[in-house]
């Protein structure tokens, strides 16, 4: 017997300080060095921090739970991608792409035309995502990650020439 299940609807929404518990919960599931609820609260207290999250309807996730998120800093001339995380059971569904497109479009709408990020040298899926948006390797930070001593690659983006939704 087949059961019809409701179609999952995905929404990418701007997050705020009331989302700190959901953000830190997702971080603890996805990150080796997760941000805490307090770290998110402190970041949201500043005017340069922005975050977007994936929420699903008709999903086993609770309405406040996040399937993924992206956090960035805006400076007058640059958007810095701080973190992007998607629940393991929701990866390979385009959520990372939706989050990145949303964050870059938001930055572009405020007049920002440059992007920067750091990524673990071993994180091939993330590197592929970033390069698909036009990010190019600009350098390397040796021994950057405290947990493993792994190098970080520095990527930059000229959003005057980028595709915000490849």
Language model feature labels by segment:
Residues 44-45, 96, 124, 147:
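Generic structural signal for helix capping and beta-alpha/helix-loop junctions
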């Amino acid at each position: 017997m087949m059961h019809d299940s409701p179609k999952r609807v995905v929404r990418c929404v701007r997050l705020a300080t009331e989302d700190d518990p959901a953000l830190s919960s997702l971080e603890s599931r996805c990150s080796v060095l997760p941000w805490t609820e307090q770290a998110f609260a402190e970041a949201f207290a500043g005017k340069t921090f922005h975050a977007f999250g994936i929420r699903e309807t008709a999903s086993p996730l609770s309405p406040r739970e996040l399937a993924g998120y992206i956090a960035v800093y805006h400076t007058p001339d640059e958007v810095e991608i701080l973190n992007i995380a998607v629940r393991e059971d929701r990866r390979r569904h385009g959520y990372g792409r939706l989050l990145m497109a949303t964050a870059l479009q938001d930055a572009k709408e405020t007049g920002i035309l440059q992007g920067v990020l750091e990524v673990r040298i071993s994180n091939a899926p993330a590197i592929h995502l970033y390069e698909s948006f036009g990010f190019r390797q600009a350098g390397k930070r040796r021994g950057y990650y405290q947990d493993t001593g792994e190098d970080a690659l520095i990527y930059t983006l000229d959003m005057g020439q980028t595709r915000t939704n490849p």
